Amino acid sequence: NLFQFAKMINGKLGAFSVWNYISYGCYCGWGGQGTPKDATDRCCFVHDCCYGRVRGCNPKLAIYSYSFKKGNIVCGKNNGCLRDICECDRVAANCFHQNKNTYNKNYKFLSSSRCRQTSEQC
């Protein structure tokens, strides 16, 4: 669920880091359209696409098991859609960490008018 996703992000990037990714670029936060602005925004685009492929439960609400082992996110013994959601969140949190140097403060709270290009397909 989104709370667990936030904990994954904070675990990879430090306490309260999740706030950097709420309303960032064209895809981080609720909804999304246009072309991702940078590698960080692309992490959110890929995460949105991943959630869109999940069947059988609500990715934003379903609770799955996971843990941190030596700084790595490890999805637990989830089945079906819970496993899929955990993997979506794990990959995105790792993506934010791998691309933290692309983070651009100018894309925080970006106006939706800057995201009007034709949206990419997943």
UniProtKB/Swiss-Prot annotation:
Residues bound to Ca(2+): Y27, G29, G31, D48
Active site: H47, D89
EC code: 3.1.1.4
Pfam families: Phospholip_A2_1
Location in the cell: Secreted
Main subcellular localisation: secreted
Enzyme type, top EC level: hydrolase
GO molecular function ontology, one term from the record: phospholipid binding
Known cofactor(s): Ca(2+)
Any single Gene Ontology cellular-component annotation: extracellular region
Subunit structure of this chain's protein: Heterodimer of A (AC P04084) and B chains; non-covalently linked. The A chain (acidic) is non-toxic, and increases the toxicity of the B chain (basic). The A chain may act as factor stabilizing the complex structure and hence retaining its toxicity by preventing non-specific binding. Upon binding to the target membranes the A chain is postulated to dissociate.
Miscellaneous note of the record: Negative results: the B chain (not complexed with the A chain) does not induce neurotoxic symptoms, hemorrhage, organ injuries and other macroscopic changes.
UniProt family annotation: Belongs to the phospholipase A2 family. Group II subfamily. D49 sub-subfamily.
Role played: Heterodimer: postsynaptic neurotoxin. Monomer: snake venom phospholipase A2 (PLA2) that shows hemolytic activity and inhibition of platelet aggregation. The hemolytic activity occurs only in presence of fatty acids (unsaturated fatty acids facilitate induce a strong hemolytic activity, whereas saturated fatty acids induce a slight activity). The inhibition of platelet aggregation is almost maximal when aggregation is induced by collagen, and arachidonic acid, whereas it is only of 30% when the aggregation is induced by ADP. PLA2 catalyzes the calcium-dependent hydrolysis of the 2-acyl groups in 3-sn-phosphoglycerides.
Name of this protein: Basic phospholipase A2 vipoxin B chain
Organism: Vipera ammodytes meridionalis
Lineage, uppermost ranks: Eukaryota, Metazoa, Chordata, Craniata, Vertebrata
